[in-house]
Amino acid sequence: MMNGGGGGRVPTWRERENNRRRERRRRAIAAKIYAGLRAYGNYTLPKHCDNNEVLKALCNEAGWTVEPDGTTYRKGCKPPASELADQLGRSPSASPCSSYQPSPRGTSSFPSSGSSSQITLGGGGGGEGSSLIPWLKTLSSAGVGIGGGSSSKFPAHYSYFGGGSISAPVTPPSGSPPRTPRLKTAAWEEYHHHHAGSVLPPWATVGASYAYAASSSLPNSTPPSPRRKVAAAAAAAGGGNDAAAWLAGFQISSAGPSSPTYSLVAPPPNPFGAAAAAAGSSSRVMSGACSPVAGGDVQMADAARREFAFGGEGGKMTGLVKAWEGERIHEECGSDDLELTLGSSMTRGDR
């Protein structure tokens, strides 16, 4: 059921129970405080009182006066009505009965060279109202000096707005403010001077030389493309200016088939040379799907060629790896002996 006063949600039973328990605890603590003040202190507290009555009693004992509207001040030092009206919105003024004494004007942690540029926040006398105009003039002149290049220093009496302080504004020491250091470009200018005609960064040139050295000396399980090797060799031979050819080796050619199953159905070329071709021309052929045949640009050494080539008919080539039974396709009968019979009871013996 919604409350008549507002349109908020209805608190649950657990929330209502927590609120009741919290309120009972608060009232029990307040009752003990009131009982102690009545028993052990000179406090005139009514039987049913709230926190305001306790605060009034404590202020009276401390020598303060609390009026019915809540105005509180020391006894015998009642401030004027105009000052009481401005207590909430303005800073308190110096009073002989006030416990808050503002710091005297003109004091600052840094010596100020210009006294006319100080700004007093929170109001003051009539003579201080005209100090804003010189400060704005100083600020505008300082901005022109910074933007136009005639002066790169802030004035020594540059004022800052304090965060709620009513004392004199804090001024920085009479020195130039910290300046962002200029980026050092000597190394880049030197490199640009020596490599004026190159359009590639240093890592490209180094990468080209390393790619050529790796492709010519280090063994690789995936053989590089001849186009990439030629580009790397040209990049290493031409230096930094011709290193663009090395990057050209990374371009993907669109002339080849885009189907991922092309390499599975296309018959791979025979990279093992004429000897393996002659040995594989018998009735037993090699399976292209199971044999370790790579792409068309594979270049194998003679030792690896002799070590990993399959044996031919009758084992003519010694030292070769013998193909296991599943690697070879046995053709026991010729193609003319094969016949497709569909639902016929005739057999080869009946013919």
Curated annotation (Swiss-Prot):
<dbReference type="GO" id="GO:0003677">
    <property type="term" value="F:DNA binding"/>
</dbReference>
<dbReference type="GO" id="GO:0006351">
    <property type="term" value="P:DNA-templated transcription"/>
</dbReference>
<dbReference type="InterPro" id="IPR008540">
    <property type="entry name" value="BES1_N"/>
</dbReference>
<feature type="region of interest" description="Disordered">
    <location>
        <begin position="69"/>
        <end position="126"/>
    </location>
</feature>
<keyword id="KW-0805">Transcription regulation</keyword>
<dbReference type="Pfam" id="PF05687">
    <property type="entry name" value="BES1_N"/>
</dbReference>
<keyword id="KW-0804">Transcription</keyword>
<dbReference type="GO" id="GO:0003700">
    <property type="term" value="F:DNA-binding transcription factor activity"/>
</dbReference>
<dbReference type="GO" id="GO:0009742">
    <property type="term" value="P:brassinosteroid mediated signaling pathway"/>
</dbReference>
<comment type="function">
    <text>May function in brassinosteroid signaling.</text>
</comment>
<feature type="region of interest" description="Disordered">
    <location>
        <begin position="1"/>
        <end position="24"/>
    </location>
</feature>
<feature type="region of interest" description="Required for DNA-binding">
    <location>
        <begin position="9"/>
        <end position="93"/>
    </location>
</feature>
<keyword id="KW-1070">Brassinosteroid signaling pathway</keyword>
<keyword id="KW-0238">DNA-binding</keyword>
<protein>
    <recommendedName>
        <fullName>Protein BZR1 homolog 4</fullName>
    </recommendedName>
</protein>
<dbReference type="InterPro" id="IPR033264">
    <property type="entry name" value="BZR"/>
</dbReference>
<keyword id="KW-0341">Growth regulation</keyword>
<feature type="compositionally biased region" description="Low complexity">
    <location>
        <begin position="102"/>
        <end position="120"/>
    </location>
</feature>
<feature type="compositionally biased region" description="Polar residues">
    <location>
        <begin position="90"/>
        <end position="101"/>
    </location>
</feature>
<comment type="similarity">
    <text>Belongs to the BZR/LAT61 family.</text>
</comment>
